[in-house]
Amino acid sequence: MAIFSVYVVNKAGGLIYQLDSYAPRAEAEKTFSYPLDLLLKLHDERVLVAFGQRDGIRVGHAVLAINGMDVNGRYTADGKEVLEYLGNPANYPVSIRFGRPRLTSNEKLMLASMFHSLFAIGSQLSPEQGSSGIEMLETDTFKLHCYQTLTGIKFVVLADPRQAGIDSLLRKIYEIYSDFALKNPFYSLEMPIRCELFDQNLKLALEVAEKAGTFGPGS
């Protein structure tokens, strides 16, 4: 069981904190000789497989690493342009790792804003007054859990569908936010959370929840 991600969204719909705790990925790594027998193309500043599905590599997968070095968008971590590098026969043999494209910071901001809007729509559509809004969304691979405070801050956790005790974990995260963000004299309300103690205690809470499978009182 696992907790995949934690998001904190302010009352205006802005993403003020995000942590990827654990994200299972269907990744495939293979060593290639020249010429590369896959067709790669640039799309949305990512290098994607356009043709040549094989050995766990799928159309739409992105180039994640070359020779063990991470790829960020269209460039490797040391600044090499991916398509240019792979087009040079002198660089072969080459090991390439493929997988689902990772979300960019801008995409995470956009998704947080979209969820904020959906939450508001859900509250308005409720036949009963005082609706709590969206508390959980379920898919076949994860569950999204949301807890909104009285001040409008939303704490969102993406977790394995089998993970128990998320309601208690959400309230624990709120407690950590109150203790290590709100009480930090250098933190401004509604602004991105950059507090080391908040990071440390949040990661510890996630570890406890994952190991126990639940997060009960006294944790």
Swiss-Prot record:
GO terms for biological process: autophagy; COPII vesicle coating; dendrite development; endoplasmic reticulum to Golgi vesicle-mediated transport; vesicle coating; vesicle tethering. SMART domains: Sybindin. It comes from the Eukaryota. Its main location: membrane. Disulfide bonds: none annotated. Pfam families: Sybindin. GO terms for cellular component: cytoplasm; cytosol; dendrite; endoplasmic reticulum; Golgi membrane; Golgi stack; postsynaptic density membrane; presynaptic active zone. Component of the multisubunit TRAPP (transport protein particle) complex, which includes at least TRAPPC2, TRAPPC2L, TRAPPC3, TRAPPC3L, TRAPPC4, TRAPPC5, TRAPPC8, TRAPPC9, TRAPPC10, TRAPPC11 and TRAPPC12. Interacts with SDC2. Core component of the TRAPP complexes which has a function of guanine nucleotide exchange factor activity for Rab1 GTPase. Plays a role in vesicular transport from endoplasmic reticulum to Golgi and autophagy. May play a role in dendrite postsynaptic membrane trafficking. This is Trafficking protein particle complex subunit 4. The gene is TRAPPC4.
